């Protein structure tokens, strides 16, 4: 099937938040069964939000990818503040949660800087920096992850 790429950012993008893009992963007006959904972050804003990827199953997506655009100057260079940044929004929940399902083959998260915002609030053993559940394969690659407080589980 098709690869459907949507831009995420503030300057003339398809979506202004990651949550809005994720909410449309089950939209039949955008995707068809077997499609590969790609959300591309742009370095024109800091995304202050927690990520929860659990869509795409009812429409039958093949893969889901959240990455930064590969346009020149947009991807991080292995150092802080050199590409799209997602900053932890809530000390009361997991920062990145992927709840896969049997119909989506894989979820890939790549080339993004994740800033825990120095969250040192302990919320017990049930809060994580990255939480993964489900049957979907998860690939977390070429990301920067920093400032995750000592009170949280990694």
Residue ranges of each PLM-predicted region?
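Extracellular beta-strand/beta-solenoid scaffold signature
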Residues: 50-52, 89-100, 120-133, 151-154
């Amino acid at each position: 099937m098709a690869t459907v790429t949507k831009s995420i950012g503030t300057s003339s993008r398809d979506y202004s938040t990651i949550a809005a893009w994720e909410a449309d992963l089950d939209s039949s007006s955008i995707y068809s069964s077997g499609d590969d959904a790609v959300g591309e972050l742009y370095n024109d804003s800091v995304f202050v939000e927690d990520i929860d990827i659990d869509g795409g199953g009812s429409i039958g997506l093949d893969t889901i990818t959240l990455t930064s655009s590969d346009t020149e100057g947009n991807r991080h260079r292995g150092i802080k503040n050199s590409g799209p940044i997602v900053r932890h929004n809530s000390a009361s929940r997991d920062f990145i949660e992927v709840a896969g399902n049997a119909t989506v083959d894989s979820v890939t998260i790549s080339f993004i800087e994740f800033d825990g915002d120095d969250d040192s609030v302990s919320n017990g053993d049930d809060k994580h920096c990255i939480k993964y559940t489900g049957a979907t394969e998860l690939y977390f690659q070429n990301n920067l992850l920093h400032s995750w407080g000592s009170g949280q589980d990694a």
